[in-house]
A protein has these predicted regions:
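Bacterial N-terminal signal peptides that target proteins for export
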Residues: 1-7
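Alpha-helical cap/lid subdomain in secreted, periplasmic
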Residues: 56, 72-214
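Serine-esterase "nucleophile elbow" of acetyl-processing enzymes
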Residues: 19-66, 76-84
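N-terminal helical cap/lid subdomain that shapes the substrate entry/recognition surface
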Residues: 67-71
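N-terminal signal peptide c-region/cleavage motif recognized by signal peptidases
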Residues: 13-15
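Absolute protein N-terminus
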Residues: 1, 20-22, 185
Length: 214
């Protein structure tokens, strides 16, 4: 009798291991990967810390590959999308611009990625990017519209850009070099912190609205 009571007590008080934190896979390029930064200062780790500090446990999986395009992301997504993935963030497109990909190709690749995730009943959040003006107004207009168009067509969540807060400062005539690495392209740890403070509330809302977290 005592033995049975002890077993029951263990069952009632033991931690439950059948549940784990939701896993969010971030499919991206160098900013997601944490190019030029120690792992602890990279975007994924800082993102995890933001959620932890705000009382929400989420496991972010770093699917960033420096230099990757939407074509590369499309190739990687199917085998990266394991059964334990709760949601996918797609943050690709910058390297398509650098290589001069036609906007319609980028859109097609992103559309296929979204279809793959939705086909597996995995919610998707799309993070956009902006084309520079040196490709011409038509290219920039067509490219920049990809992400908002897809978000509407596929009925998915959308964040305009990782770098939106930095670009906003530039548009005000402010210098943001103190937030960038020596290459002038990739955010340094302070820049990543600015990015995380910008995207995290929007990401939190997405995870709540898709019932991934309460």
């Amino acid at each position: 009798m005592l033995h049975k009571a002890i077993i029951n007590l263990i069952i009632l008080t033991a931690p439950t291991f059948c549940y784990s934190d939701p896993k969010v896979f971030i499919l991206g390029d160098s900013i997601t990967h944490g190019f030029g930064l120690p792992e602890e200062e990279g975007l994924v780790n800082q993102l995890s810390n933001w959620f932890s500090n705000n009382g929400t446990a989420v496991s972010f999986i770093n699917g960033g590959v420096s230099g990757d395009t939407t074509a590369g992301g499309l190739e990687r997504l199917s085998w990266s999308l394991t059964e334990d993935i709760s949601a996918v963030i797609v943050a690709l497109g910058s390297n398509d611009v650098l290589r001069g990909f036609p906007p319609e190709i980028t859109k097609e690749n992103l559309s296929e990625m979204i279809d793959i995730a939705q086909g597996n009943k995995v919610p998707v959040l799309l993070i956009g990017t902006y084309a520079p003006g040196n490709y011409g107004e038509e290219y920039k207009s067509n490219f920049d519209a990809i992400f908002t168009d897809l978000a509407e067509e596929k009925n998915i969540a959308y964040i305009d850009s990782y770098l939106k807060p930095l670009l906003d400062e530039v548009s005000k005539g402010k210098d943001v070099m103190h937030l960038l690495q020596a290459d002038g392209l990739h955010p340094n740890p302070h820049g990543v912190r600015v990015v995380v403070e910008y995207i995290s509330p929007q990401l939190l809302k997405f995870l709540q609205e898709t019932n991934i977290i309460e």
